[in-house]
Amino acid sequence: MVRIRLTRMGKKKQPFYRIVVVDQRKRRDGAYIESLGYYDPIKDPYILNVDVDKAVDWILKGAQPSQTVKNLLRKAGVFKKVDEIKRTKKKEENQ
């Protein structure tokens, strides 16, 4: 199964994270399929940069986000776009 999760980058006591698509059997910092953005929790306010189109594409393909990534993607507005796409597909099927 393919997951969307965080991989830790940065140096000791100064982490930042990449949001990546990875096979769930891989290690946390192992090889990943594609990078979707990054998250820096240390900055005030935090920095969140997500390629929304890529994230939507992977979610529609069936990639499962971790709970933390799900919360971050919700803040970035990814799930609103996914819902819109699913609604338009249902309307097209019904007509």
UniProtKB/Swiss-Prot annotation:
A single BP term in Gene Ontology: translation
GO CC term (a single one): cytoplasm
A GO MF term: structural constituent of ribosome
Pfam families: Ribosomal_S16
Keywords attached to this entry: Ribonucleoprotein, Ribosomal protein
Family the entry assigns: Belongs to the bacterial ribosomal protein bS16 family.
NCBIfam families: S16
PANTHER family cross-referenced by the UniProt entry: 30S RIBOSOMAL PROTEIN S16, SMALL RIBOSOMAL SUBUNIT PROTEIN BS16M
Protein name, entry field: Small ribosomal subunit protein bS16
